[in-house]
Amino acid sequence: MNIHTLLSEKIQQALVAAGAPADCEAQVRQSAKAQFGDYQANGVMAIAKQLGLPPRKLAENVVGLLNLDGIARKVDIAGPGFINIFLEPSWLANHLAAALSSPRLGIASVASQTIVVDYSAPNVAKEMHVGHVRSTIIGDASVRTLSFLGHNVIRANHVGDWGTQFGMLIAYLEKVQDGGEAEMQLSSLESFYRAAKQHYDEDPAFAERARGYVVKLQGGDEYCRQMWRKLVDVTMAQNQKTYNRLNVTLTRADVMGESLYNDMLPGIVADLKAKGLAVESEGATVVFLDEFKNKEGEPMGVIIQKKDGAYLYTTTDIACAKYRYETLKADRIIYYIDSRQHQHLMLAWTIVRKAGYVPESVPLEHHMFGMMLGKDGKPFKTRAGGTIKLTELLDEALERARRLVAAKNPSMDAGELARLAQVVGIGAVKYADLSKSRTTDYVFDWDNMLSFEGNTAPYMQYAYTRVASIFKRSGQDEQQLTGDIRLEAEQETQLAVRLLQLEEAIATVARDGTPHVLCAYLYDLAVLFSAFYEHCPILNAENAALRQSRLQLALLTARTLKKGLDLLGIETVERM
């Protein structure tokens, strides 16, 4: 049930009937204050200016033509022409009952599209670090939401599995394999990479062999390919453990590394030349883009092949977009990559559009995000200034959560304590990120994210268990609830309206890739439930009918919180 869409359509029809153009926008919004109703339509002023009418007069005409019988109990006009809509409690109650009887909480599936979502993208032979957190968990929340709405979502883990560094890595893997130390060395990818780099820098013979392996690997040599595949497999097996800990839906089958596009690159360069988009410049192959200017004010030159024949990341990204449209049949392509890569993507996509590889009808969207900062406002690092490994961050989250939970539940058995620490600790790390606008930098703060107060995972998880516990205390099975939902108290009505706004929050996340909108919705819902719980006795209601009604509101709240948190990739438990 999308109230916003319903009201927008109704008000637009009335606007058109009042003389507004067919493409006018009603600008319906959820009201910030109860005195202005449940929804406001703010589009009258702009349309009145177009029509040369006093806004108040147009608003009166629209309200006179507006048919909200059975939907709104009152419609009034405020100020110069704001239309305030107060929803009818009986209408709300009917839709709450429908949501309660629906496995999807009354949310309809949409017309399915094939949507490719590019996220996570770690590098082979390197451990995942905190810099991978935002792409991985924001991208996964987007994927979960789009899938829930009925889209065919293709997860694309654009792993860095190609490049000149692989000659060095293969040469070192060969060296340690000969010494029987391969498994031990590969157990710490970071150490393996550093040792390989040290050998490359200090041993000329090793470096020469490494450079030779680069050429052989790129030429398809089977031995080098076999060694390369081992490096990829070991890395992704370790990454999969991290994804599982994070409750992220990526699997090995979702890996679409840079190497996937290698065979396309010569054809891309030849095609761009044939179309007159790429030219030779100082031995390199370059695309000059009028849409972007360099420091001298001249068209920006984008190198797609160096004079030594090597291809660049841009060439791979052009091929990648082409593949996603032509082979994967994408209707929409979304990239969760940090904001520093924005110009790089814009250059690649401009070439993609000019070459006709992806039509304008297929959106290419960069859902960029800011950096993770420490409390000092600087990029989040170890005290020594090094990069924090993701496994170490998650280990600390679990230990902090274990101490927190143990302090609140001294008698809890070890197994339940470990499970609860996992849910709370991982949930805290994820929710702290997801609850902030992805376009801004955010400060990583253990104390805030593990607090049981405010918009945090522990608060939200506790809110769910609190609602769920009501049923245990009621002694009544969920399936045995009977009777109509009655909305008499103000707190009941406010909770009812918010419950029915879940679809609006989900639709926003699906459109804009902004999970913080869903977090804000769920937090607001939890706060409204607290007010309802405080002012409207549930188990000790005045009569049986009211008790049944309020239990139904509690049940729908629990299901909504659980579904919303699940879409964010946050687990819930029945007891905390």
UniProtKB/Swiss-Prot annotation:
Catalysis: reaction(s): tRNA(Arg) + L-arginine + ATP = L-arginyl-tRNA(Arg) + AMP + diphosphate
Keywords assigned by UniProt, alphabetized: Aminoacyl-tRNA synthetase, ATP-binding, Cytoplasm, Ligase, Nucleotide-binding, Protein biosynthesis
GO MF annotation list: arginine-tRNA ligase activity; ATP binding
Cellular compartment(s): Cytoplasm
Locus of motif 'HIGH' region: 122-132
Tagged with keyword Transmembrane helix: no
Main location class: cytoplasm
ATP-binding among keywords: yes
Domain of life assignment: Bacteria
InterPro entries, alphabetized: aa-tRNA-synth_I_CS, Arg-tRNA-ligase, Arg-tRNA-synth_N, Arg-tRNA-synth_N_sf, ArgRS_core, DALR_anticod-bd, Rossmann-like_a/b/a_fold, tRNAsynth_Ia_anticodon-bd
Any one biological process term the GO annotation gives: arginyl-tRNA aminoacylation
Entry GO CC: cytoplasm
Catalytic activity, EC: 6.1.1.19
Coiled-coil portions: none
Assembly with partners or alone: Monomer.
Family designation: Belongs to the class-I aminoacyl-tRNA synthetase family.
Protein name: Arginine--tRNA ligase
Organism: Sodalis glossinidius (strain morsitans)
Gene from which this protein is expressed: argS
